Amino acid sequence: MAAGTAARKAAPVLEAPPQQEQLSHTKLSAEDTWNLQQERMYKMHRGHDSMHVEMILIFLCVLVIAQIVLVQWRQRHGRSYNLVTLLQMWVVPLYFTIKLYWWRFLSMWGMFSVITSYILFRATRKPLSGRTPRLVYKWFLLIYKLSYAFGVVGYLAIMFTMCGFNLFFKIKARDSMDFGIVSLFYGLYYGVMGRDFAEICSDYMASTIGFYSVSRLPTRSLSDNICAVCGQKIIVELDEEGLIENTYQLSCNHVFHEFCIRGWCIVGKKQTCPYCKEKVDLKRMISNPWERTHFLYGQILDWLRYLVAWQPVVIGIVQGIIYSLGLE
Protein backbone atom coordinates (compact mmCIF):
# COMPACT_ATOMS: atom_id res chain seq x y z
CA MET A 1 0.00 0.00 0.00
CA ALA A 2 2.74 2.42 0.95
CA ALA A 3 4.80 1.34 -2.09
CA GLY A 4 1.87 2.05 -4.44
CA THR A 5 1.37 5.49 -2.91
CA ALA A 6 5.06 6.29 -3.33
CA ALA A 7 4.97 5.17 -6.97
CA ARG A 8 1.96 7.38 -7.70
CA LYS A 9 3.73 10.36 -6.13
CA ALA A 10 6.92 9.70 -8.06
CA ALA A 11 5.24 9.45 -11.48
CA PRO A 12 4.30 13.16 -11.83
CA VAL A 13 7.77 14.15 -10.72
CA LEU A 14 9.32 12.20 -13.60
CA GLU A 15 6.93 13.73 -16.22
CA ALA A 16 7.21 17.32 -14.99
CA PRO A 17 10.58 18.39 -16.51
CA PRO A 18 9.59 17.74 -20.18
CA GLN A 19 6.37 19.67 -19.63
CA GLN A 20 8.24 22.60 -18.10
CA GLU A 21 10.78 22.51 -20.94
CA GLN A 22 7.99 22.55 -23.50
CA LEU A 23 6.30 25.47 -21.80
CA SER A 24 9.59 27.35 -21.59
CA HIS A 25 10.09 26.97 -25.36
CA THR A 26 6.60 28.27 -26.07
CA LYS A 27 7.21 31.32 -23.89
CA LEU A 28 10.38 32.33 -25.77
CA SER A 29 10.12 35.60 -27.64
CA ALA A 30 11.29 36.07 -31.21
CA GLU A 31 14.49 37.71 -30.01
CA ASP A 32 15.24 34.88 -27.58
CA THR A 33 14.61 32.31 -30.31
CA TRP A 34 17.00 34.12 -32.61
CA ASN A 35 19.65 34.24 -29.87
CA LEU A 36 19.19 30.52 -29.24
CA GLN A 37 19.67 29.75 -32.92
CA GLN A 38 22.81 31.89 -33.02
CA GLU A 39 24.20 30.05 -30.00
CA ARG A 40 23.56 26.67 -31.66
CA MET A 41 25.20 27.91 -34.86
CA TYR A 42 28.23 29.11 -32.91
CA LYS A 43 28.60 25.72 -31.19
CA MET A 44 28.26 23.92 -34.52
CA HIS A 45 31.04 25.94 -36.19
CA ARG A 46 33.38 26.17 -33.18
CA GLY A 47 36.92 25.09 -34.04
CA HIS A 48 36.43 25.31 -37.83
CA ASP A 49 38.46 28.49 -38.35
CA SER A 50 40.82 27.03 -40.97
CA MET A 51 37.92 25.56 -42.90
CA HIS A 52 36.12 28.91 -42.89
CA VAL A 53 39.24 30.63 -44.22
CA GLU A 54 39.39 28.13 -47.09
CA MET A 55 35.72 28.74 -47.90
CA ILE A 56 36.23 32.52 -47.92
CA LEU A 57 39.26 32.20 -50.21
CA ILE A 58 37.30 29.98 -52.59
CA PHE A 59 34.46 32.51 -52.67
CA LEU A 60 36.81 35.44 -53.37
CA CYS A 61 38.65 33.56 -56.14
CA VAL A 62 35.41 32.52 -57.85
CA LEU A 63 34.08 36.07 -57.51
CA VAL A 64 37.15 37.60 -59.17
CA ILE A 65 37.22 35.02 -61.97
CA ALA A 66 33.49 35.45 -62.61
CA GLN A 67 33.88 39.23 -62.77
CA ILE A 68 36.69 38.93 -65.34
CA VAL A 69 34.69 36.46 -67.45
CA LEU A 70 31.55 38.61 -67.38
CA VAL A 71 33.45 41.78 -68.32
CA GLN A 72 35.16 40.04 -71.25
CA TRP A 73 31.88 38.51 -72.38
CA ARG A 74 30.15 41.89 -72.25
CA GLN A 75 32.91 43.57 -74.26
CA ARG A 76 33.22 40.86 -76.93
CA HIS A 77 29.62 39.68 -77.28
CA GLY A 78 27.46 42.38 -75.74
CA ARG A 79 24.21 41.31 -77.41
CA SER A 80 24.28 37.73 -76.13
CA TYR A 81 25.40 38.93 -72.69
CA ASN A 82 22.46 41.33 -72.47
CA LEU A 83 19.96 38.69 -73.59
CA VAL A 84 21.21 36.06 -71.11
CA THR A 85 21.34 38.62 -68.30
CA LEU A 86 17.81 39.79 -69.06
CA LEU A 87 16.54 36.21 -69.10
CA GLN A 88 18.12 35.51 -65.72
CA MET A 89 16.79 38.79 -64.34
CA TRP A 90 13.35 37.66 -65.40
CA VAL A 91 13.49 34.04 -64.16
CA VAL A 92 15.73 34.01 -61.05
CA PRO A 93 13.40 36.13 -58.84
CA LEU A 94 10.52 33.83 -59.81
CA TYR A 95 12.31 30.85 -58.23
CA PHE A 96 12.98 32.63 -54.93
CA THR A 97 9.48 34.13 -54.92
CA ILE A 98 7.81 30.72 -55.14
CA LYS A 99 10.26 29.17 -52.67
CA LEU A 100 9.79 31.92 -50.04
CA TYR A 101 6.03 32.46 -50.68
CA TRP A 102 6.32 36.14 -51.63
CA TRP A 103 2.88 36.31 -53.22
CA ARG A 104 2.78 40.11 -53.45
CA PHE A 105 5.93 40.23 -55.54
CA LEU A 106 4.72 37.24 -57.57
CA SER A 107 1.45 39.00 -58.46
CA MET A 108 3.27 42.18 -59.52
CA TRP A 109 5.84 40.14 -61.45
CA GLY A 110 3.08 38.25 -63.25
CA MET A 111 1.18 41.41 -64.19
CA PHE A 112 4.36 43.10 -65.45
CA SER A 113 5.36 39.99 -67.40
CA VAL A 114 1.98 39.62 -69.13
CA ILE A 115 1.79 43.27 -70.23
CA THR A 116 5.45 43.43 -71.25
CA SER A 117 5.13 40.20 -73.23
CA TYR A 118 2.21 41.68 -75.15
CA ILE A 119 4.18 44.89 -75.78
CA LEU A 120 7.18 42.86 -76.95
CA PHE A 121 4.92 40.82 -79.24
CA ARG A 122 3.52 43.99 -80.80
CA ALA A 123 6.99 45.50 -81.24
CA THR A 124 8.38 42.47 -83.09
CA ARG A 125 5.55 42.11 -85.62
CA LYS A 126 6.15 42.70 -89.33
CA PRO A 127 4.71 44.86 -90.78
CA LEU A 128 4.74 47.18 -87.78
CA SER A 129 1.52 48.94 -86.88
CA GLY A 130 1.63 52.73 -86.82
CA ARG A 131 0.30 52.82 -83.25
CA THR A 132 2.81 50.35 -81.84
CA PRO A 133 5.83 52.68 -81.28
CA ARG A 134 3.73 55.17 -79.35
CA LEU A 135 2.20 52.37 -77.27
CA VAL A 136 5.59 50.83 -76.53
CA TYR A 137 7.26 54.05 -75.46
CA LYS A 138 4.34 55.19 -73.34
CA TRP A 139 4.31 51.87 -71.46
CA PHE A 140 8.02 51.82 -70.76
CA LEU A 141 8.07 55.53 -69.93
CA LEU A 142 5.36 54.80 -67.34
CA ILE A 143 7.44 51.92 -65.94
CA TYR A 144 10.48 54.19 -65.81
CA LYS A 145 8.65 56.93 -63.89
CA LEU A 146 6.98 54.49 -61.48
CA SER A 147 10.23 52.64 -60.77
CA TYR A 148 12.05 55.93 -60.22
CA ALA A 149 9.31 57.07 -57.81
CA PHE A 150 9.40 53.76 -55.90
CA GLY A 151 13.18 54.00 -55.65
CA VAL A 152 13.06 57.54 -54.27
CA VAL A 153 10.30 56.69 -51.78
CA GLY A 154 12.17 53.61 -50.59
CA TYR A 155 15.42 55.53 -50.18
CA LEU A 156 13.68 58.30 -48.20
CA ALA A 157 11.93 55.73 -45.99
CA ILE A 158 15.26 54.07 -45.18
CA MET A 159 16.93 57.41 -44.40
CA PHE A 160 14.00 58.57 -42.24
CA THR A 161 14.14 55.30 -40.30
CA MET A 162 17.88 55.63 -39.72
CA CYS A 163 17.32 59.20 -38.47
CA GLY A 164 14.48 58.12 -36.17
CA PHE A 165 11.69 60.08 -37.91
CA ASN A 166 9.47 56.99 -37.86
CA LEU A 167 8.90 57.58 -34.13
CA PHE A 168 6.95 60.77 -34.91
CA PHE A 169 4.38 58.66 -36.78
CA LYS A 170 4.43 55.85 -34.16
CA ILE A 171 5.76 53.34 -36.71
CA LYS A 172 8.08 50.55 -35.66
CA ALA A 173 11.59 50.77 -37.03
CA ARG A 174 11.41 47.25 -38.45
CA ASP A 175 8.16 48.00 -40.33
CA SER A 176 9.40 51.27 -41.82
CA MET A 177 12.75 49.74 -42.77
CA ASP A 178 11.02 46.78 -44.43
CA PHE A 179 8.80 49.17 -46.38
CA GLY A 180 11.81 51.19 -47.51
CA ILE A 181 13.85 48.17 -48.59
CA VAL A 182 10.94 46.59 -50.47
CA SER A 183 10.06 49.86 -52.23
CA LEU A 184 13.69 50.46 -53.18
CA PHE A 185 14.05 46.93 -54.54
CA TYR A 186 10.83 47.23 -56.56
CA GLY A 187 12.00 50.51 -58.06
CA LEU A 188 15.44 49.23 -59.00
CA TYR A 189 14.31 45.82 -60.23
CA TYR A 190 11.51 47.02 -62.49
CA GLY A 191 13.69 49.93 -63.58
CA VAL A 192 16.28 47.45 -64.86
CA MET A 193 13.68 45.24 -66.52
CA GLY A 194 11.90 48.17 -68.16
CA ARG A 195 15.08 49.70 -69.58
CA ASP A 196 16.35 46.39 -70.98
CA PHE A 197 13.04 45.46 -72.61
CA ALA A 198 12.68 48.99 -73.99
CA GLU A 199 16.10 48.71 -75.62
CA ILE A 200 15.12 45.44 -77.31
CA CYS A 201 11.84 46.92 -78.54
CA SER A 202 13.62 50.05 -79.78
CA ASP A 203 16.03 48.02 -81.92
CA TYR A 204 13.29 45.84 -83.39
CA MET A 205 10.90 48.69 -84.20
CA ALA A 206 13.48 51.07 -85.61
CA SER A 207 15.06 48.40 -87.82
CA THR A 208 11.60 47.26 -88.98
CA ILE A 209 10.62 50.79 -89.96
CA GLY A 210 13.87 51.08 -91.92
CA PHE A 211 15.22 54.41 -90.67
CA TYR A 212 17.63 52.77 -88.24
CA SER A 213 20.00 49.81 -88.34
CA VAL A 214 22.34 48.62 -85.61
CA SER A 215 25.32 47.96 -87.86
CA ARG A 216 24.31 49.22 -91.34
CA LEU A 217 23.08 52.38 -93.04
CA PRO A 218 19.34 53.21 -93.01
CA THR A 219 17.37 51.44 -95.73
CA ARG A 220 15.00 54.37 -96.30
CA SER A 221 15.44 58.10 -96.79
CA LEU A 222 13.90 60.38 -94.18
CA SER A 223 11.61 63.25 -95.14
CA ASP A 224 11.54 66.50 -93.22
CA ASN A 225 8.08 65.88 -91.75
CA ILE A 226 8.51 62.19 -90.82
CA CYS A 227 9.56 60.87 -87.40
CA ALA A 228 12.40 58.36 -87.73
CA VAL A 229 11.29 56.46 -84.61
CA CYS A 230 7.66 55.69 -85.44
CA GLY A 231 7.60 56.55 -89.17
CA GLN A 232 4.49 58.72 -88.78
CA LYS A 233 3.96 62.24 -90.05
CA ILE A 234 4.80 65.18 -87.78
CA ILE A 235 1.86 67.57 -87.53
CA VAL A 236 2.96 70.07 -84.84
CA GLU A 237 5.61 72.55 -85.95
CA LEU A 238 8.73 73.27 -83.90
CA ASP A 239 7.58 76.71 -82.77
CA GLU A 240 4.03 75.56 -81.93
CA GLU A 241 2.66 74.28 -78.62
CA GLY A 242 0.95 70.91 -79.06
CA LEU A 243 -2.11 69.80 -77.14
CA ILE A 244 -0.78 66.32 -76.37
CA GLU A 245 2.90 66.41 -77.33
CA ASN A 246 5.40 68.78 -78.91
CA THR A 247 7.97 68.32 -81.66
CA TYR A 248 11.67 68.07 -80.80
CA GLN A 249 14.65 68.83 -83.01
CA LEU A 250 18.08 67.38 -82.28
CA SER A 251 21.43 69.01 -82.92
CA CYS A 252 21.58 67.14 -86.26
CA ASN A 253 18.38 69.00 -87.34
CA HIS A 254 16.24 65.84 -87.44
CA VAL A 255 12.79 66.26 -85.89
CA PHE A 256 10.78 63.73 -83.87
CA HIS A 257 7.62 63.37 -81.83
CA GLU A 258 8.13 64.20 -78.16
CA PHE A 259 7.09 60.79 -76.80
CA CYS A 260 9.09 58.97 -79.47
CA ILE A 261 12.42 60.70 -78.86
CA ARG A 262 11.95 60.66 -75.08
CA GLY A 263 11.27 56.95 -75.15
CA TRP A 264 14.21 56.40 -77.50
CA CYS A 265 16.73 58.31 -75.38
CA ILE A 266 15.49 58.03 -71.79
CA VAL A 267 13.77 54.66 -71.71
CA GLY A 268 15.60 52.85 -74.49
CA LYS A 269 19.06 54.01 -73.31
CA LYS A 270 19.88 55.34 -76.77
CA GLN A 271 22.28 58.29 -76.85
CA THR A 272 22.36 58.76 -80.64
CA CYS A 273 20.00 60.04 -83.31
CA PRO A 274 17.73 57.23 -84.60
CA TYR A 275 18.57 58.16 -88.22
CA CYS A 276 22.12 59.50 -88.53
CA LYS A 277 23.50 58.08 -85.22
CA GLU A 278 24.89 61.46 -84.15
CA LYS A 279 25.30 61.86 -80.38
CA VAL A 280 22.24 63.37 -78.71
CA ASP A 281 22.56 66.34 -76.36
CA LEU A 282 20.09 65.42 -73.63
CA LYS A 283 20.57 68.72 -71.78
CA ARG A 284 19.40 70.61 -74.84
CA MET A 285 16.55 68.25 -75.60
CA ILE A 286 15.16 68.06 -72.04
CA SER A 287 15.02 71.32 -70.13
CA ASN A 288 13.48 69.95 -66.92
CA PRO A 289 16.37 68.80 -64.68
CA TRP A 290 14.17 66.21 -62.94
CA GLU A 291 13.67 64.34 -66.24
CA ARG A 292 17.35 63.99 -67.14
CA THR A 293 18.95 60.60 -67.06
CA HIS A 294 21.08 60.29 -63.93
CA PHE A 295 24.34 58.42 -64.38
CA LEU A 296 24.36 57.31 -60.74
CA TYR A 297 20.89 55.81 -61.16
CA GLY A 298 22.12 53.94 -64.24
CA GLN A 299 25.11 52.58 -62.31
CA ILE A 300 22.86 51.42 -59.49
CA LEU A 301 20.72 49.59 -62.05
CA ASP A 302 23.84 47.88 -63.44
CA TRP A 303 24.87 46.80 -59.94
CA LEU A 304 21.42 45.37 -59.28
CA ARG A 305 21.52 43.59 -62.64
CA TYR A 306 24.71 41.83 -61.57
CA LEU A 307 23.39 41.13 -58.06
CA VAL A 308 20.12 39.53 -59.20
CA ALA A 309 21.27 37.80 -62.39
CA TRP A 310 24.80 36.61 -61.71
CA GLN A 311 25.33 36.55 -57.94
CA PRO A 312 23.14 33.44 -57.48
CA VAL A 313 25.20 31.72 -60.19
CA VAL A 314 28.44 32.61 -58.41
CA ILE A 315 27.09 31.37 -55.07
CA GLY A 316 25.93 28.14 -56.70
CA ILE A 317 29.41 27.54 -58.17
CA VAL A 318 31.02 28.22 -54.79
CA GLN A 319 28.67 25.80 -53.03
CA GLY A 320 29.42 23.14 -55.65
CA ILE A 321 33.19 23.52 -55.13
CA ILE A 322 32.81 23.44 -51.34
CA TYR A 323 30.65 20.32 -51.52
CA SER A 324 33.09 18.55 -53.86
CA LEU A 325 35.99 19.31 -51.50
CA GLY A 326 34.10 17.96 -48.49
CA LEU A 327 34.01 21.29 -46.62
CA GLU A 328 31.00 21.72 -44.32
From Swiss-Prot:
Quote the InterPro entries the UniProt record gives.
Answer: RNF121/RNF175, Znf_C3HC4_RING-type, Znf_RING, Znf_RING/FYVE/PHD
Q: Name one GO cellular component term.
A: Golgi membrane
Q: Where are the zinc fingers (RING-type)?
A: 227-277
The membrane topology noted for this protein in its Swiss-Prot or TrEMBL record is: Multi-pass membrane protein
Q: What is its main location?
A: membrane
Q: Where does the UniProt annotation locate this protein?
A: Membrane
GO biological process, alphabetically ordered: ERAD pathway
In its keyword annotation, does this UniProt entry include Zinc-finger?
Answer: yes
**GO molecular function term, any single one:** ubiquitin protein ligase activity
Listed A to Z, the keywords are: Membrane, Metal-binding, Transmembrane, Transmembrane helix, Zinc, Zinc-finger
Transmembrane helix recorded as keyword: yes
List all membrane-crossing ranges. 51-71, 83-103, 104-121, 149-169, 180-200
- UniProt cross-references to PANTHER family, sorted A to Z: RING FINGER PROTEIN 175, RNF121 PROTEIN
Specify the protein name: RING finger protein 175
Q: Which organism is it from?
A: Homo sapiens
Q: State the organism's lineage.
A: Eukaryota, Metazoa, Chordata, Craniata, Vertebrata
